[in-house]
């Protein structure tokens, strides 16, 4: 079939301006449908086969070998720098950051980059956003924390992450704190639970800290766990929307049920002892079968799309791990590191398993569950709009459905920094931002939709950003479309140097239209921002 007919048909279906079609097709086909070109070495992979660099790799590769699945090659440096920035700090690298990393001759540059990113301020911003989903940090309906409580809660979460607070301490403070929801931020863990009956609290605790959906448990097992939270009291104060969370041993029916740990062992409590503290001590004990397993599995899923137990918040006996030895290894590492989550991040990020290319070496159905290649996944809504704003030099307006004095957000604030799930935008809603109503991982939806594609292809929202773009100004103000200008453009948008073919296409399109033709520059930027390579983690 004549390729010109195929291309013209594609233009018609997508509404692509004809003079931009060559650029768009070149950009789109690089990673279209998650299938990069299968050449010996592409922009997405190196020519190097992986070799086990530690215990994680030994366990993953041994399982793949038993399944006769060949792992992907290692990813290229260009892919790694973009992947690491997105996965660790939820931010795309600048063109200069990408260029310096790619050109560096330091044999340990990947390890050095990981260490650097784990100490960046954006690490706390991004992971506070992720924990905000799980802990339901939301001011308005149906969580109703109220704006100043939501912001205090978010600040405490962010400060805990920034200070690398041990995860067992983080969990214990959430479970045992008492006081004002405005002045003792972790008590908002209880305030953010919709069903504040003991059974409702128990289900949320099990989901958050054990990765278990306790509503599926036998009634007597759930009742035993709920008894630990039967004395959680709440009372209002004279300050509007302030609430005090406290241990209330006189609460009606507080001692009607006997607290029983999920292991089936009955707890021994004194009359004046807060059962929450007894449960928290049991939960974070290194011998506990759920606590370390839950967070180790979640961290793995956050970095590699799926848990070793999948889904990561549905741990149960009939949902076994795909690699039990691997999960046990991560649990052991976390416990011996005294629940230092950065230690866990560092181990996973430095593994060859994490650094595999997104280009699979086969099509066996078991490959994905056993981590034979890096999974393709669309950027989080917040990460995507921040990337668009950064690349175009524009800002975004975020508002709450019920405006309050506390919810004014300056336009320069990035989406990953938003402290409250009630503060949003139509873009964030369209692109699947978590509702923060249940704490389930599935609330966040990164699956692409037709509405999203149409928005990126045809919306005035993106068009306005492109018209104001610094990149467009650079392309139109350059006296000559030199290789350096094209290199800088690709490094800024895709965090890599263009291939020779891409450089020729871009040069011909711009020179063919006149290199000062603003519309051609806008179209070029638009084409790359609509490419799967830009929109997906890879």
Model-derived regions, located:
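Bacterial N-terminal signal peptides
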Residues: 20-33
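Short, structured secondary-structure elements
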Residues: 41-265, 277, 290-331, 339-476, ...
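Penicillin-binding protein/beta-lactamase superfamily catalytic region
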Residues: 269
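Boundary at the C-terminal end of the N-terminal hydrophobic targeting segment
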Residues: 34-39
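N-terminal secretory signal peptides that target proteins for export/translocation
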Residues: 1-17
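Conserved micro-motifs of the catalytic ATP-binding
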Residues: 495
